[in-house]
Regions:
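Beta-strand-rich N-terminal accessory domains
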Residues: 36-81
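Extended, loop-rich substrate-binding clefts of extracytoplasmic carbohydrate-active enzymes
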Residues: 80-133, 143-145
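A contiguous, surface-exposed recognition patch within enzymatic or periplasmic domains that forms
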Residues: 149-256
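Beta-strand-rich domain onsets/edges
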Residues: 274-300
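A short, amphipathic beta-strand motif
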Residues: 297-308, 335
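Short, acidic Ser/Thr/Gly-rich low-complexity loop/linker segments typical of extracellular
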Residues: 321-338
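A short, solvent-exposed beta-strand micro-motif common in secreted/extracellular proteins
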Residues: 335, 344-355
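Structured interaction patches on ligand/partner-binding surfaces of diverse proteins
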Residues: 355-374, 378-381
Length: 396
């Protein structure tokens, strides 16, 4: 027979095993199912299905490269009335392939003629990194549209949204809000591209956003205004528009644009780490994306300062050529500016007082180099001219 100490030891062993069993049972209920997901992909005859290993699972159609499903925390937010999320106006039959370049990256490549679209997932992130490569005019519109189910998001009547429930004035693109008397254009937002980092929508529990790219291959410069979001009870669309061909006076640029990021959140704003000026991109260098130029192949321009600046005006320094465009804000106090991650080449540098060009020169950027400019004096501001009288001021 067991003595008293042996019985006590046996009881303690049983209780310990019971406690461990109960803890495991409880954890099975409190750990979200998404946390048990494995990073990876599967495929069938219709779709590639990518599990990010976080809360996002998405599908890409093997026929044309559309995103056909965006499942976040178990709910599919993609599409409406048989429309998916897609590049350009949607592609025809395409060559769509999938690969896993590393243990933490999955990439889908879509080739349609001379257009290439890339979707990249990183392990443990609720983000899809996207890139678009165009080589010629066979691609008429350079844009990406994320289409979301309208029943899952509120209708937002804001100044940077196109709201198609207004009364139509002209060509199905110009609308009026009879309650306020305001007129809206589908293709003209009140928000300049330099003034926003992302566009999107939230229902309080889930947010879906496009974090814009640096727009180096876009058209229009820092003050470009275009369609950003439309939002009604029948459609929610988020846009990354690089070239739309709406009588634009700037050149159409070719090559690779990206990354721009489709980011899902638990209702809040996307992380500022995804912003074009903040995003770390060294992990992209080894993916073999057509046209990609890493940070080592780029350069910088810095200006010591700007003289003859007028108070109460913002000064922006823009750079452009036929291959790329960039911009940066000058310091309000002394006009210091720095523009980083520029592709090599010779650029027209323009200083803007608000949106008025007041100084222009050429600068050359080299890979890995920094071009330092001595203090610049603005000489082309018409506000400096003597006049008899003037209403307002020149500001573009």
């Amino acid at each position: 027979m067991k003595n008293e100490s042996q019985l006590k030891s046996s009881k303690r062993g049983v209780l310990l095993r019971l406690a461990i069993f109960m803890a495991l049972m409880i954890s099975a209920f409190i750990i979200p199912s998404s946390a048990l997901a494995d990073f990876g992909y599967t495929e069938d005859s219709t779709n590639y299905t990518i599990d990010t290993g976080a809360n996002l699972v998405f599908k890409v159609k093997r026929s044309n490269g559309d995103i056909s499903s965006l499942i976040y925390n178990g709910t599919d937010y993609n599409g409406y009335t048989n429309k998916n999320s897609h590049v350009e106006i949607g592609l025809g039959q395409s060559d769509v392939t999938i690969s896993q370049p590393s243990s933490s990256v999955i990439m889908v490549k879509v080739v349609y003629g001379t257009l290439e679209q890339y979707y990249v997932a990183r392990k443990g992130e609720n983000n899809i990194y996207m890139f678009t490569y165009i080589a010629d005019d066979s691609v008429t519109v350079t844009r990406y549209i994320v289409r979301l189910k309208p029943s899952l998001f509120p209708v937002l009547n804001t100044s940077n949204s196109w709201y198609s429930s207004y009364s139509t004035l002209e060509a199905k693109d110009i609308f009026t809000d009879t309650s306020t008397g305001y007129t809206y254009s589908k293709h003209y937002s009140d928000t300049r591209v330099m003034d926003y980092n992302y566009t999107g929508i939230s229902n309080g529990n889930v947010g879906a956003y496009i974090v814009r790219s640096n727009h180096e291959k876009a058209s229009g410069g820092p003050f470009y205004r275009s369609l950003i979001r439309d939002n009604t009870n029948v459609a929610v669309n988020l846009y990354e528009i690089l070239y739309y061909g709406m009588a634009q006076t700037d050149v159409k640029r070719y090559g690779l644009q990206g990354p721009y990021v489709l980011a899902f959140t638990d209702g809040g704003e996307p992380s500022s780490k995804l912003y074009a000026g903040n995003l770390k991109t060294d992990w992209i260098d080894s993916l073999g994306i057509h046209g990609w130029v890493g940070s080592s192949g780029r350069g910088r321009v810095a200006g010591v300062g700007i003289k003859n600046m007028k108070s109460d005006y913002e000064y922006v320094v823009g750079f452009s050529n036929d291959e790329a465009q960039y911009w940066t804000k000058a310091s309000d106090s002394n006009g210091y500016f720095s523009c980083t991650n520029m592709l090599p080449g010779t650029y027209t540098m323009t200083i803007y007082k608000n949106e008025l060009a007041v100084y222009t020169t050429d600068v050359t950027v080299t890979a890995g180099g920094t071009k330092i400019l001595n203090s610049i004096t603005i000489t082309d501001d018409p506000s400096d001219n003597d006049v008899t009288w003037r209403i307002g001021d020149w500001d573009g």
